[in-house]
Amino acid sequence: NITIVPILNDSPLKLDILDLTTGFKMGLVEVSECEQSTVGTIMVKNNATSPLLLVDGEEVAGAKQNRIIGQSMLIPPNTSIPIPVNCSEQGRWNYKSEFKHSNYMANSETRCRKAEYNMDNSIRASQGAVWDSIEDLQVKRNSFSKTSALRDNYEKIEKTNDDYLKHFGIYENQVGVIARLENKVGLDVFANHSLYEQYSDCLLYTSDA
């Protein structure tokens, strides 16, 4: 019950931009709790010589609790800054491990609810909406997580979603996607094909989570 429309561009922007997954793999990105830990903010250090792209809804797992990126942004090279986030694991506030990319993004419903508050620059107010959306997802999928972690919901349907992804390919000049689910439409567009390719599976994986 989902329709996917590719967004193509024969003249993409030739920009050298680092994505978060690659940054972690290459050891060029460090993500940590702030010196005084707070739910709504984490520190991101970009040690690369290229700008680092953080995408709205992208999840990092570990530290005191899993978080999702509060809004899309570019972090300049050799820069360390605090960034706005939302908690995606309501039932944990104890250190687990260093942050890493969780390989998942918030599902489209969670991103949509969060965005309604973020338009008013209210990350704190959006936190309740994020938790409510994750709870709704657990009910929808008849799943359970001891810490109400968004990531746990995805891991329990990983095989089903992997089979689902096999039906969708990527065009050579594709830079984004439009997804229609029932009466809702969403889209994500990137500067070029290589960036979109890094996020393609993640976006489709969570479009109908």
Annotate each PLM feature.
Residues 50-58:
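Short, hydrophobic/aromatic beta-strand segments
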Residues 120-182:
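Charge/polar-rich, low-complexity and marginally structured segments
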Residues 205-209:
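Conserved small/polar residues in nucleotide/adenosyl-binding loops
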Residues 91-138:
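Terminal connector regions
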Residues 64-97:
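Intrinsically disordered, low-complexity Pro/Gly/Ser/Thr-rich segments with frequent PxxP/GP/PP motifs
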